[in-house]
Amino acid sequence: MPTFRSNIVVFNLIARRAFTTTSTKNMGFVEKVRLLDYWKIQDSALQSEFPRSRLVLMVDRRLLVTKDQPDVQMVELSFDDLKQRLGEYGLQFDLSNSCLLDALSTDVDMIPLFGTSIDAADPPEDSPISKKEVLKQLGNSLGGRFTDIRMAMLTMREERQRNLLAKFQSLTKWASIYRRCPKCAAALKMRSSKSGAECVTCQRVYYPTFSPVSITLITDPTNEHALLVRHRGSAGGVFTAVAGFAHSGESMAECARREIAEEVGIEVDSIRSLDMSQPWPMPDSSLMIAHVAVAKIDQKISVCPDELETAQWFTRHQVKEALTTTLADPLLKNLPRTLDDRQTLHYIPPAGAIAHQMIRQWVDGKLENHNSRI
């Protein structure tokens, strides 16, 4: 059943539609989130709003973004435009492969923003048609281009865009996995919003989950050196901060301290949380929570070979040079190719990553490392 507060919001929304002189610019944040809450749990209401919605699109897990670089943004389309364009390529969408992302203001009321994800069929092996070329043509017809989700997350400048993409990918993947009740194995009825699923037998309700991750920039007591790591299998020459998943029963500070010990084999003297976090949808949904830690620079580094290729202390000047290179080459087109050069600091993660923001603040002298001991 809808909550009382949600019913009030919906009544107000209907009134606004009836008397169009009232602008949604006067609708506050509370009204917006209560409307979203109503849409999340009321399938019939969301179904009636679907034809009025705006949508962003993924095809074969590739996101439709603007052609402009480096200011990458998701392309938003009206329901009718997207339906027509996809229909020309034999593609369809409906609520079953769409998820609710946000509520957008119009001059009259608020409309839903959906993400819709489509899997395109592969052409026959002997077909002269190239699927890659078809997707390129589709992207052009929709006013954009398709790109890898990870690259989109790393290069989008706007936090709202990155967070919406993280939500889009996370809900889409969760809805594709949660088909059976983990308790009784009966079928689950997925909400149209993809915000939850209810067991048809035991009525247990399941919600999308995410895993908390600590990401920590380690500095020395002088705050003039930072310890950065290169993950096994990552792009050559790219160094980042230490990160790892929290375990049951751990605080985030305890998680950060343990991950540092596991991955680089040193102890930290102090650690504090930064007012920074980032949803990250790959490979599974997580929330990265930023910390800064202080460790003595004379400790012997012992990397975990299963996780890392190398970990090194760098001066502020060295890290600043890598930051400058990254800003000049945000798509990492000039990555080093030789094995030795891959182990040298050339880049930090692109601007869309929380690690970039942490490292950049430290380079600019805005990240102090003093605080309480663990």
Curated annotation (Swiss-Prot):
GO terms for cellular component: peroxisome. PROSITE patterns: NUDIX (PS51462), NUDIX_BOX (PS00893). PANTHER family: NAD(P)H PYROPHOSPHATASE NUDT13, MITOCHONDRIAL (PTHR11383:SF3), NUCLEOSIDE DIPHOSPHATE-LINKED MOIETY X MOTIF 13 (PTHR11383). This is NAD-capped RNA hydrolase ndx-9. The keyword Manganese applies. The gene is ndx-9. Belongs to the Nudix hydrolase family. NudC subfamily. GO terms for molecular function: metal ion binding; NAD+ diphosphatase activity; NADH pyrophosphatase activity; RNA NAD-cap (NMN-forming) hydrolase activity. A motif (Nudix box) lies at residues 244-265. It comes from the Eukaryota. Substrate binds at Y207, A243, G244, F245, E259, E263, E307. Mg(2+) 3 binds at E259, E263, E307. Mg(2+) 1 binds at A243, E263, E307. Its cofactor is Mg(2+); Mn(2+); Zn(2+). Homodimer. InterPro entries: NudC-like_C, NUDIX_hydrolase-like_dom_sf, NUDIX_hydrolase_CS, NUDIX_hydrolase_dom. Keywords: Hydrolase, Magnesium, Manganese, Metal-binding, NAD, Zinc. mRNA decapping enzyme that specifically removes the nicotinamide adenine dinucleotide (NAD) cap from a subset of mRNAs by hydrolyzing the diphosphate linkage to produce nicotinamide mononucleotide (NMN) and 5' monophosphate mRNA. The NAD-cap is present at the 5'-end of some RNAs; in contrast to the canonical N7 methylguanosine (m7G) cap, the NAD cap promotes mRNA decay. Mediates the hydrolysis of some nucleoside diphosphate derivatives. Coiled coil: none annotated. GO terms for biological process: NAD catabolic process; NADH metabolic process; NADP catabolic process. Residues 208-336 form the Nudix hydrolase domain. The keyword Nucleotidyltransferase does not apply. Gene3D superfamilies: 3.90.79.20, Nucleoside Triphosphate Pyrophosphohydrolase. Zn(2+) binds at C181, C184, C199, C202. Mg(2+) 2 binds at E259. It catalyses: a 5'-end NAD(+)-phospho-ribonucleoside in mRNA + H2O = a 5'-end phospho-adenosine-phospho-ribonucleoside in mRNA + beta-nicotinamide D-ribonucleotide + 2 H(+); NAD(+) + H2O = beta-nicotinamide D-ribonucleotide + AMP + 2 H(+); NADH + H2O = reduced beta-nicotinamide D-ribonucleotide + AMP + 2 H(+). It comes from Caenorhabditis elegans. A motif (Microbody targeting signal) lies at residues 367-369. The lineage of its organism: Eukaryota, Metazoa, Ecdysozoa, Nematoda, Chromadorea.
